[in-house]
């Protein structure tokens, strides 16, 4: 961690303020946090024109600087996208309270009762690129789950991020809110984002949302636990028993509905026995949607124009480019996914339920789907209200991370003068009786 400087005195002070506010926030009740979220949504609504105008500034500057088209798509926050984010805040406010849930209730002995209760993590630090709507999502989930948040967005979204954060903090400052605005803070410089990595003791979890390089750098340069994913190299496998028309429709949606998203497919795998019929329908459909296809020799003989190179199989294009490969069978498809995939989201299209079940069991990704678009890998679409990120790690939380990924638990033990010596000496014995939750 020699490349990461010590945090500045100013950053330490800001992080300390967030920590103190988070302690108070963690003691609020469900109604208080819900009212605070509605106040945040109201403030965003009232300032929506200012936020959209700030986003136009960011878009114009980024276009002039030659920002990649995939990042430009993520950067855009128009009125429709902003309204969806505001609606998401209200949705989060209506979700069941994630705090204070009793997960375990056990009598260890008479008048000695153990409970396991859900509690906030404390303070989360989130580093993300280009996505200003992520500020809204993350802030709302943090407040709902009783956590403070330090957020660092990409410099390309600076004006938008500041306008959004100003609105969120203004909402928390309203009379109807019992949550301190200090629970949320926006970091704006590279020095602050590097300093964030050294805030162990003040920050409990770091969530990176961005490129593989960003995630790897953070994982290698902090002692704070990191939750996140790097690449989203998602696959769609068209089985021999697929319905061609259904498969074409789902495959096109999985690529083109929002190609800059991490849950868009990057590689299409097609069973050899259906390749001729499927590609005859799919290639024109993809071409009509503006998708560039890069394939192996067999798929090129069936209409794919460009040749795929070895690096294409492991590339997250985040654009209208798709790799295509013809495979012998399900085993070849799953082996390809194991070798090149990023354990994000994989899809099988088939009318054979037994084959689908084998795929769902064999593929070790955060999401495995049967006969539906990969684009459903999203916290809002899962009914989480929003997501703080997507985790491709094996340990939980995994996949789209909503409120459940921002809470931990605490053991509470209530006794009446009980001492361990009595049990060690055999004067008392444990009953270990589970009680109703």
From Swiss-Prot:
Protein role: Catalyzes the NADPH-dependent reduction of L-glutamate 5-phosphate into L-glutamate 5-semialdehyde and phosphate. The product spontaneously undergoes cyclization to form 1-pyrroline-5-carboxylate.
Cysteine disulfide partners in this protein: none
GO cellular component terms given for this protein: cytoplasm
The name this protein goes by in its record: Gamma-glutamyl phosphate reductase
Keyword Amino-acid biosynthesis: yes
Lineage: Bacteria, Bacillati, Cyanobacteriota, Cyanophyceae, Synechococcales
Pathway: Amino-acid biosynthesis; L-proline biosynthesis; L-glutamate 5-semialdehyde from L-glutamate: step 2/2
InterPro entries membership: Ald_DH/histidinol_DH, Ald_DH_C, Ald_DH_N, Aldehyde_DH_dom, G-glutamylP_reductase_CS, Glu-5-SA_DH, GPR_dom
Subcellular locations according to the entry: Cytoplasm
Enzyme class label: oxidoreductase
EC assignment: 1.2.1.41
UniProt keyword list: Amino-acid biosynthesis, Cytoplasm, NADP, Oxidoreductase, Proline biosynthesis
UniProt similarity note: Belongs to the gamma-glutamyl phosphate reductase family.
Pfam families assigned: Aldedh
Transmembrane segments: none
GO biological process per UniProt: L-proline biosynthetic process
GO MF: glutamate-5-semialdehyde dehydrogenase activity; NADP binding
Domain of life: Bacteria
Catalysed reaction, written as an equation: L-glutamate 5-semialdehyde + phosphate + NADP(+) = L-glutamyl 5-phosphate + NADPH + H(+)
Species this protein is from: Synechococcus sp. (strain CC9902)
């Amino acid at each position: 961690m020699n490349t990461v400087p010590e945090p500045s005195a100013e950053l330490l002070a800001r992080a300390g303020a967030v920590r103190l506010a988070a302690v108070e926030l963690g003691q609020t009740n469900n109604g208080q946090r819900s009212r605070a979220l509605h106040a945040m949504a109201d403030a965003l609504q009232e300032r929506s024109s200012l936020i959209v105008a700030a986003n136009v500034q960011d878009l114009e500057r980024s276009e002039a600087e030659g920002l990649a088209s995939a990042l430009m798509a993520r950067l855009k926050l128009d009125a429709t996208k902003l309204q969806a984010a505001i609606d998401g805040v209200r949705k989060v406010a209506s979700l069941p309270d994630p705090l204070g849930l009793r997960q375990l209730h056990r009598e260890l002995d008479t008048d000695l009762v153990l409970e396991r209760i859900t509690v906030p993590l404390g303070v989360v630090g989130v580093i993300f690129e280009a996505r200003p709507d992520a500020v809204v999502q993350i802030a709302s989930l943090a407040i709902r789950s009783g956590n403070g948040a330090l957020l660092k967005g990409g410099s390309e979204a600076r004006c938008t991020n500041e306008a959004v954060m100003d609105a969120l903090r203004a909402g928390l400052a309203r009379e109807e809110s019992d949550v301190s605005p200090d629970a949320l803070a926006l970091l704006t410089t590279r020095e602050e984002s590097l300093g964030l990595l050294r805030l162990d003791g003040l920050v409990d979890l770091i969530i990176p949302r961005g490129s593989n390089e960003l995630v790897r750098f953070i994982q290698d340069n902090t002692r704070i636990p990191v939750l996140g994913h790097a690449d989203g190299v998602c696959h769609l496998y068209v089985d021999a028993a697929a319905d061609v028309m259904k498969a074409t429709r789902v495959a096109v949606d999985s690529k083109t509905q929002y190609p800059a998203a991490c849950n868009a497919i990057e590689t299409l795998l097609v069973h050899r026995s259906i390749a001729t019929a499927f590609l005859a329908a799919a290639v024109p459909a993809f071409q009509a949607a503006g998708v560039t296809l890069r394939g192996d020799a067999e798929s090129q003989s069936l209409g794919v124009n460009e040749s795929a190179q070895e690096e294409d199989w492991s590339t997250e294009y985040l654009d209208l480019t798709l790799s295509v490969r013809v495979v012998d069978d399900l085993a070849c498809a799953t082996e390809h996914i194991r070798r090149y995939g990023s354990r994000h989201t994989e899809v099988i299209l088939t009318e054979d339920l037994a084959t689908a079940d084998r795929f769902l069991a064999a593929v070790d990704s955060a999401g495995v789907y049967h006969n539906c678009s990969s684009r459903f890998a999203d916290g809002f679409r899962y009914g989480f209200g929003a997501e703080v990120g997507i985790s491709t790690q094996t340990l939980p939380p995994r996949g789209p991370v909503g409120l459940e990924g921002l809470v931990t638990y605490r053991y509470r033990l209530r006794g009446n003068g009980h001492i361990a010596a009595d049990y060690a000496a055999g004067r008392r014995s444990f009953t270990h009786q589970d009680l109703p939750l």
